Amino acid sequence: MSKFELLTKHIETFESDNFGEWFIDKENDGSPEHPIQMPYVMYTRAIDDFIEDVHRFVDQHKEMRLTNYHGVLEERGIDIGEAKQADIEKIDAIGLCALIVANVRAERFCDGAILSSCKDGTLLKWLNKLRSFDEKKPLDEVIKRIEDSKKSSTSTSSNSKPQRILEKSKISDGR
């Protein structure tokens, strides 16, 4: 499993238009006998699974300090109130994870925060960008291995062609 797959496996969920719906109490009149229940969002099972996986991801990756998502975003110059407008091309993978966690945690204080980010495509955009970090990683590893092999071959190869030419010229000069 790739590093961010626990989150990015949900991309297909966000490509649909079925995320959940608002529950609005229309049966009760607000009297003491029939108090009105505050509106809330009933998310689909797929969105509930995503929310659970976000929490699981935070627990599994303590090195990212995502429990302090606010601090992680501040370190990257991202104002949590402007998170949806953040330029994701300039944000690293940990910053993207912090944006996702912030959005999920916002639901506790603002019903419908996740639904809004589903409908406007914000979560889909963040998850697609996060997936690009997983896709880029194998290429980065290949490049690093090539560079490492070049370094080791030049440092271990004392009989390289330029080295041999230099040695031959020293012999012919009598040095």
Label for each model-derived stretch:
Residues 99-144:
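Amphipathic alpha-helical binding modules
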Residues 1-59:
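Short terminal alpha-helical segments
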Residues 43, 47-72, 76, 114:
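Compact disulfide-stabilized, cysteine-rich extracellular microdomains and processed peptide cores
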